[in-house]
Curated annotation (Swiss-Prot):
Subunit relationships: Component of the eukaryotic translation initiation factor 3 (eIF-3) complex. The eIF-3 complex interacts with pix.
Molecular function via GO: mRNA cap binding; translation initiation factor activity
PANTHER family on file: EUKARYOTIC TRANSLATION INITIATION FACTOR 3 SUBUNIT 7 (PTHR12399), EUKARYOTIC TRANSLATION INITIATION FACTOR 3 SUBUNIT D (PTHR12399:SF0)
Full protein name: Eukaryotic translation initiation factor 3 subunit D-2
Principal place of residence: cytoplasm
HAMAP family: eIF3d
Subcellular localization: Cytoplasm
Length: 550
């Protein structure tokens, strides 16, 4: 049987009798490749790569053989003579990994500072000392951040203003940063129970579902009043506070608190603790009811006050667009039917046309003997083919400049890439969309209608057109935008527990204008009495106070 197997022949092994390593004579004909320790080893090829590194194309190339002096040119003997190049050949430097760094004219920090100073002086001669100082202080786009470290690039370009000036007699109670708030959770929250329903709703005009870029509609100005009364000014909440609940608020106040971790701008909420009852209020100013524009964008509006594209002007524009759109898409008119709720509008006035608004007063059990009573709202109603009614929350997104940073031109992408447009809005207006979603969930709306409204001209902030509409189910939309309702309820419950442990009095919750944190202050009872008197004196000049009249 052994004859069937091939014989085993021992391989030839080199043996160096006079030293260590391979024999010198045996490796004479082995080809040798020069090696430099600056070469990157360990990567032979990558068949899955889609594109090469454009910045360092010679990252994996050898340091030897790249320059012209090592190149071989096959030429005829009679053409071997050539003139000497006095310019010199261009030396291709190998890819370096941080070794042998020496400061030079270009990378020396001192020279960078000197060049920056000379550049500022030159700009000052052209633009004047005022604009030059602003350029030196805040930089100019990418050029202003080019020579800064990575950790400084994401800092705000300028300090934001606080929504309220903290006085010296205010006592700090608590400071909670956003990472701690994001860890809170209050799961298994049940749907709120209806207590009282008030108001009348117009029916939705389904013709606006067919609006697109080729069939746009002009946005009209609707002369209707929307009341934005705070908690303690609501007659229904005053009546309910005598018999039920111990925490009272409105949906916009709750949404602001629940979505505080997504906010960048400063805001404040006043809290009054009277025994076992807690009232969440907003101050008598119009800023709380204003909609923000590009609040969470990497480059929020930075124009000066008075400009059409300043933060305040854009906020006013977005607020009026939202009001007009929410009424225009409804079937208005005396001959149109209305869906009336159990009780009339509590803010009804003689001779004043109110906007289509349905108020729903609901209560939630937050545990630990906490019963929340809040006023929520619907904007419209629609009837299904089977006869069922669906309540709507109607909101509008507005485009103010298609050429702005981190934006997509709606007139080109809205019909074909609506998902990309909405994704961009979620990135630039994450806080505003989250608050709209929370308000819809609290009210129990069946649909959240979003409208896309754009300026007729980028420089004209008074005329707008409707480019399209889109609808979502609030709970599903909350999942799409990564809005955790358990975390929202946990944040609210945490702040309520902190206030319950404090003595009776007035408190204020404020979002820090420049830090991701919420501060709680104990303030005097007459803290905002001067603001109230100023508001009453200038009530004729305000665009809207407790009511928004467009």
């Amino acid at each position: 049987m052994s004859k069937n197997y091939a014989p085993f022949i021992k391989p030839y092994m080199q043996y160096n009798e006079h030293g260590w390593g391979p024999c010198e004579l045996d490796v004479v004909d082995v080809p040798y490749q020069p090696f430099s320790k600056s070469d990157r080893l360990g990567k032979i090829t990558d068949w899955t790569v889609t594109q090469q590194d454009k910045k360092f194309t010679n990252k994996y190339a050898s340091s030897f053989g790249n320059n012209n002096q090592y190149a071989y040119f096959h030429e005829e003997d009679d053409e071997s003579f050539r003139l000497v190049d006095s310019v010199g050949s261009k030396v291709i430097k190998p890819y370096q990994r941080g070794r042998g760094f020496r400061p030079s004219v270009h990378n020396n920090p001192r020279n960078v500072r000197n060049q920056r100073g000379r550049k500022g002086n030159a700009m000052g001669n052209i633009m004047g000392p005022g604009l030059a100082s602003i350029t030196q202080r805040y930089g100019k786009g990418r050029d202003g951040r080019r020579n800064q470290g990575r950790k400084y690039r994401n800092l705000p370009a300028r300090l934001r203003e606080s929504s309220v000036v903290v006085q010296s007699d205010w006592v700090s109670v608590k400071e909670i940063d956003f990472p701690r708030l994001l860890k809170l959770s209050l799961p298994n929250m049940k749907e709120g129970e209806d207590i009282v329903t008030c108001g009348a709703l117009d029916y939705y005009d389904k013709a606006y579902d067919r609006v697109n870029l080729k069939n746009e509609r002009t946005l009209m100005k609707i002369d209707r009043i929307v009341h934005t009364a705070t908690t303690t000014d609501d007659p229904i909440i005053r009546r309910l506070s005598k018999t039920m609940g111990n925490v009272f608020a409105t949906d916009d106040i709750l949404a602001t608190i629940m979505c505080c971790t997504r906010s960048n701008y400063s805001w404040d909420v006043v809290i009054e603790k009277l025994g076992t009852k807690i009232f969440f209020d907003k101050r008598d100013n119009v800023k709380f009811d204003m909609l923000t524009v590009n609040e969470t964008s990497q480059e929020p509006p930075m124009d000066e006050e008075g400009s059409n594209n300043s933060a305040h002007s854009l906020s006013m524009e977005a607020t009026f667009i939202n009001h007009n759109f929410s009424q225009q898409v409804l079937k208005m008119g005396a001959e149109e039917n209305k869906f009336k709720l159990a009780e009339p509008n509590p803010f009804e006035e003689a001779g004043v046309e109110l906007a289509s608004m349905g108020y729903r007063y609901k209560q939630w059990d937050l545990g630990n003997d906490i019963t929340l009573v809040a006023r929520c709202k619907h904007n419209g109603v629609t009837q299904l083919p089977n006869g069922d009614m669906q309540f709507l929350s109607i909101r509008a997104l507005n485009e103010w400049d298609s050429k702005a940073a981190n934006s997509i031109e709606w007139r080109q992408k809205l019909d074909s890439q609506r998902g990309a447009v909405l994704s961009t809005e979620l990135r630039n207006n994450a806080c505003k969309l989250a608050k709209w979603t929370v308000e819809s969930v609290l009210a129990g709306s069946d649909q959240l209608k979003l409208g896309y409204v754009s300026r007729v001209s980028p420089r004209d902030h008074l005329r707008h057109v409707i480019l399209g509409t889109q609808q979502f189910k609030p709970q599903e939309f909350a999942t799409q935008i990564n809005l955790n309702m358990d975390n929202c309820w946990g944040i609210l419950r945490c702040l309520i527990d902190i206030i319950r442990m404090q003595p009776d009095g007035k408190y204020l919750i404020m979002k820090d204008p420049n830090k991701p944190m919420v501060r709680i202050y104990h303030i005097p009872e007459n803290a905002f009495d001067s603001d109230v008197s100023e508001e009453e004196e200038s009530s004729e000049d305000k665009p809207f106070g407790l009511s928004m009249n467009n």
